[in-house]
Amino acid sequence: MENRTASVERVTKETKIRMTLNLDGTGKSDIHTGIGFFDHMLDGFARHGLFDLSVSVDGDLDVDGHHTLEDTGIVLGTAIREAVGDKQGIRRYGDRILPMDETLVLSAVDLCGRPYLSFQAEFTREKVGEMETEMVKEFFYAVSYAAQMNLHIKVLDGGNNHHIIEAMFKAFAKALDEATSFDPRIAGVLSTKGSL
């Protein structure tokens, strides 16, 4: 079977983004967003989801990081949707409760074709590195809507903002890896409607 891949480019007055995603990769990444902590998070997403991910972003960071994070989320969600394709034979659902020291984060995914985000988290710092913590929700909102997936992220325990955000990205990666994986018992798509 061929690898499920997508290449997406998005150009606006605020950002220029190129991304390639391979859902059937080995966790290789080449990430350049201009925000070091965001690069670190996307690298963790690729590595722990075993996705190959290449991201190049030229954003208006002289304003702030808002457009860079939001638009990267739109492009990642679009790449996920395109790479998943017709969803024949995939598990559709995935979830993970992931620990990182004092932090425990739940992520659950349904590749149902209906966009929805439930995000339950509180941060105690405005930024981690140069990344604004309030933009974490905006990033995942953009991913979920562009991918047309249900995405739940809930912090069950935690104190360190770096750990919380990192656990979110890794838990999402693990949940998405499960949801996009194949089950030989599934004929067609996993839906009583016959389509997703």
Regions found by a protein language model. Give the residues of each.
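Structural preference for solvent-exposed beta-strand-turn elements
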Residues: 1-196
